[in-house]
Amino acid sequence: MKPTVWHHLRLCPHGHPDETIDDAAIAVDETGTIAWLGALSALPHGYAHWQREDLHGAWVTPGLVDCHTHLVYGGTRADEFAQRLAGVSYEEIARQGGGIVSTVRATRAADETTLFVQAAARLQPLLAEGVTAIEIKSGYGLDLASERKMLRVARQLGERFPVTVYTTFLGAHALPPEYAGRADEYIEEVCDRMLPTLADEGLVDAVDVFCERIGFSLAQTERVFEAATRRGLPVKLHAEQLSNAGGTALAARYRALSADHLEFLDEAGIEAMKAAGTVAVLLPGAYYFIRETQLPPIELLRKHGVPIALATDHNPGTSPLESLLLTLNMGCTLFRMTVPEVLQGVTRHAAAALGRADRHGALEVGRQADFAAWSVGSLAELAYWIGRPLCEQVVRGGTTVFRRMNG
């Protein structure tokens, strides 16, 4: 690529609307790295002959980060939607053999090509909203071959699309039918066979567990964390979504990257997260879709200074959401977060939730030039509009990978 100066833009380099530069410029060298950024009037003379790209006054933010998704799976769970509307709870559907296990059946039956095509269709709307990094979990295979298949598809998405994909092994997502009544044996399979094999194949960047009364116990979760730690892999946790099971405090003991959901999180868990540097990942899409009523403890998270990230939690059963911008709106309207909080929640804090704050979530000299240009008058509009296409252009590594067509 040619060295380029992107100019005539309003810059929000760290995802905070109170830290901006009007009439700014970003100089990107031939490697796709930011060489300089600041006010256009201060652009050094050495960049005068570089190629120019006019952004016509657009707001520019770091590329967005969707730090919690289940993007790869077979089928849908649209049939369960009517059950929910009739008052059947998520837990009851799961106990009847629906929920996660129904998606497991569809995922096991699908080949890699089918899973890739379906996941690609889910990914593309996110890319058109400025997402340049995304986490994708396994967890709908629940056997070695099927978990491998999911993680391979996630890696392929990162190779075929202009987005950085981080994979998370979520073998301990649910108990597969063939292990009914034998949860400890299944956890042994996860720890002793599945995780080591998939890690050795280079398919795992982090390890997650669903710690809930309809998922896995604290003791079982700790066994998975121990296995991940032995492999040198960071951990994260689905925690306190349906009850206060104490999973967050356990995750903090293992210095988890993040604890996610957190509707029933208590102050002791928050204090443990703060001490461990664990990010709180809130998932308003799931809260909305299954009509939860217990709000996550936003005020306590603020009080203790725990960084808060937001994510789509895209999945077929509780959050079939393909819009990180709608997630921002939900964070404000449902969780009563501020605009600065939600914007940092999908940039700087989301990157930290992946353990990649040094690579994503901010625009700084020496970093890869991943950014999004927005046709808005103020950054608050990113959380304000519902359904309006706001992203004009997405740049990844200094190359335009998306441009909205007008007319």
Curated annotation (Swiss-Prot):
Q: Which GO terms describe its biological process?
A: L-histidine catabolic process to glutamate and formamide; L-histidine catabolic process to glutamate and formate
Q: Offer a single GO CC term for the protein.
A: cytoplasm
Which Pfam family, an example, fits this chain? Amidohydro_1
Known cofactor(s): Zn(2+); Fe(3+)
Question: One MF term from GO for this chain?
Answer: zinc ion binding
Q: Main subcellular localization, coarse class?
A: cytoplasm
The UniProt record gives the binding positions of Zn(2+) as 68, 70, 238, 313
* Enzyme Commission number(s): 3.5.2.7
What domain of life does the UniProt record list for this protein's source? Bacteria
Listed under catalytic activity are: 4-imidazolone-5-propanoate + H2O = N-formimidoyl-L-glutamate
Q: Where in the cell is the protein located?
A: Cytoplasm
Q: How is the cofactor bound?
A: Binds 1 zinc or iron ion per subunit.
Family label: Belongs to the metallo-dependent hydrolases superfamily. HutI family.
What does the protein in this record do?
A: Catalyzes the hydrolytic cleavage of the carbon-nitrogen bond in imidazolone-5-propanoate to yield N-formimidoyl-L-glutamate. It is the third step in the universal histidine degradation pathway.
Name of the protein in question = Imidazolonepropionase
